[in-house]
Amino acid sequence: MKHTLIALACALTLSTAISTLGADAKLKYSYVPNHFDKDPGGQSQGPCHGGAALDEAGNVYVTTDTPRGITVFSKDGKFLRAVGPTRVHALEIRKENGTEYIYAARPSDHEVLKLKLNGEQVWKIAASDENQNFPDKNKFNPCAVTVAPDGSIFVADGYGSNYVLKFDKDRKFVSRFGGPGAEEGKFNTCHGIAFDSRQDKPLLLVCNRNNNRVEYWDLDGIFVKVIQKDLRMPAAVHIRGNYAVFPELQGRVTILAKDGSIAAQLGDNPKADQRANFGLPPEQWTEGITNSPHGASLDPDLNVIVSEWSKFGRVHKWAVQK
């Protein structure tokens, strides 16, 4: 009986430990130096605005402002190919009916695109489209896009109107919410957005960049709550399992657990003059220290990929410690 109780206690302890790790545990990371090809295809990676996403195979897609468009790396960091248009600001990869697609925001071109993984365009939402009836079309400079399971499209117009615009699955304008301001329920550069299914009801997780906070909104555009404040210009968000990663333009990367607590912070740059510094030359970079994190993604093992806003192009990897 004694041995049975001991075994049961051990099993419960192990179960609790696994449950904690799978839910809201702290995460530890080690930096992986020189993981990505420095000069993919024999050319400089930059300039990059700095979006990053992963496909199901683990390939890494990084946006550039070069004629190559989006550079694609293997999970081992080897350059594979270049696809799609240049000047993509942020991107999300989503699987639909067995096929993966890229959703891309292009603020300087005033459009949102749906692309195949080879870069072929499927459709676009553009201010120039006469069939679109959304307001402030002359201010349409979208920073990011996400898609709900029902096909609804949410566009963070952070460089334009400072509203999040909602379109139905057929790309027809439905509504908008937010608007410019510093108070709760308003945006000062809504710069990143993701659909979040981890809570009791589906929500949108929005990076309110210049207000230095991340927050929840419901799918009808009702403000729910601030999740974390006093961040350093959160630029984007990617969710994997119980965790969400936020690259902060002011030289840091933060990972939040499902409950909003801080699970890890990476690449913290103590030098204020190097933060959000597009032109910082490579000879001033420090291994494992970020300068201008702009896009990020978590792989299935919770390893972290970060792309920077950089004239020269800079992509990082941190490996989770198990």
List the predicted regions and their residue ranges.
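WD40 beta-propeller blade core
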Residues: 71, 113, 123, 154, ...
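Beta-propeller fold detector
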Residues: 30-37, 80-85, 122-129, 174-179, ...
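Conserved beta-propeller blade signature
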Residues: 59-62, 101-103, 152-156, 203-206, ...
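Beta-rich, blade/repeat-based domains predominating
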Residues: 41-57, 85-99, 130-152, 182-203, ...
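A short helix->beta-strand "capping" segment at the edge of beta-propeller domains
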Residues: 23-45, 278-286
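Beta-strand-rich domains and repeat architectures in extracellular enzymes and scaffolds
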Residues: 33-68, 312-314
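Short loop/turn segments immediately following the C-termini of beta-strands
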Residues: 65, 107, 158-160, 198, ...
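Blade-level signature of beta-propeller repeat domains, shared across WD40, Kelch, NHL, RCC1
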Residues: 289-322
